[in-house]
């Protein structure tokens, strides 16, 4: 491999929506950084049977619904 063209691979901490923490290796962030997940396998409707609501962060879901409300879907 060529030197100097690959991203740095380091250890980060990931915090799931229920507060569970684990360490993994990633190119995201920097050594020791913490990634807080907004959606994961414990909260995503595809994995929970669709019984939970998606959290509308940044108004994206409401913007989508407003844009397509006249289609009657």
From Swiss-Prot:
Entry GO terms, CC: ribonucleoprotein complex; ribosome
One example GO MF annotation: structural constituent of ribosome
Keywords, alphabetical: Ribonucleoprotein, Ribosomal protein, RNA-binding, rRNA-binding
Protein name in the entry: Large ribosomal subunit protein bL31
Family, similarity comment: Belongs to the bacterial ribosomal protein bL31 family. Type A subfamily.
Gene Ontology annotations of biological process type: translation
Subunit: Part of the 50S ribosomal subunit.
Gene, per the UniProt record: rpmE
Record-linked PROSITE patterns: RIBOSOMAL_L31 (PS01143)
Protein species of origin: Sinorhizobium fredii (strain NBRC 101917 / NGR234)
Gene3D superfamilies hit by this protein: Ribosomal protein L31
């Amino acid at each position: 491999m060529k030197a100097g063209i690959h991203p740095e691979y380091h250890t980060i901490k990931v915090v799931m929506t229920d507060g569970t923490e684990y360490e993994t290796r990633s190119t995201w962030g920097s050594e020791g950084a913490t990634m807080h997940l907004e959606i994961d396998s414990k909260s995503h409707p595809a994995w929970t049977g669709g019984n939970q609501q998606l959290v509308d962060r940044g108004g994206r879901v409401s913007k989508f619904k407003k844009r397509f409300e006249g289609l009657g879907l």
